[in-house]
Amino acid sequence: MSAFAGDAALEGLLKGVEARYNKAKTLQVLFHEDYTPPGRAKRTESGTLVLRKPGKMRWDYDQPKGKLFVSDGKYLWLYTPADNRAERMKLKESDDMRAPLAFLLGKLDFQKEFRNLQGKAEGSRTRITAEPKTDSLPYSAVEFVVGTDQRIQVVKVTGFDHSTLEFRFEGEKVDPQLDARLFQFQAPKGAQMVEAGQ
């Protein structure tokens, strides 16, 4: 039995969101990211996110300028300009809190990925709360805020350590032309290259 069998409106909304993002081959959107570690001040960053199926994404940060997060479908690269350091990790091994967004790069299926799905109206928008189906992920809960046009406007991820990472999206473009080179990490001159965990 479906986790929301009694809520046809929520089920219809989820199917609409799935259809919107599953049809897209590429996506471009502006993001604002708030990260709040436990017991510490919130950190706000922003920039442009581009996605290409399967498994490729690029986060170009305007704030802090020069920060870069790239997935070529196999590896994730995180470049921090303050340290002039590039860290590489395997996509499946990443416990980065951006990873929950990776499902947008594949076949979005709320029922497959999440459990305890619930919806709550907030004006013209709906807040969907869910938990990951597997305990092997570094987060315990995910919230999506979805508009009447089935666009995901907000994704909030809560980690097991009670940290929160919230993304707000605007200016979404579905299926823009994207240069394949966007998803190939090019290390800036003199950057220190390290493997994750070293």
Question: What name fits each language-model region?
Answer:
Residues 3-7:
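Boundary at the C-terminal end of the N-terminal hydrophobic targeting segment
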Residues 12, 87, 112-198:
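Gly/Pro-enriched, hydrophobic low-complexity segments
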Residues 16, 21-73:
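N-terminal mature ectodomain segment of secretory-pathway/periplasmic proteins
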Residues 39, 82-84, 161:
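Solvent-exposed strand-loop boundary residues in beta-sheet-rich modules
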Residues 48-99, 165-166:
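An acidic-aromatic
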Residues 101-117:
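Anionic-ligand binding region
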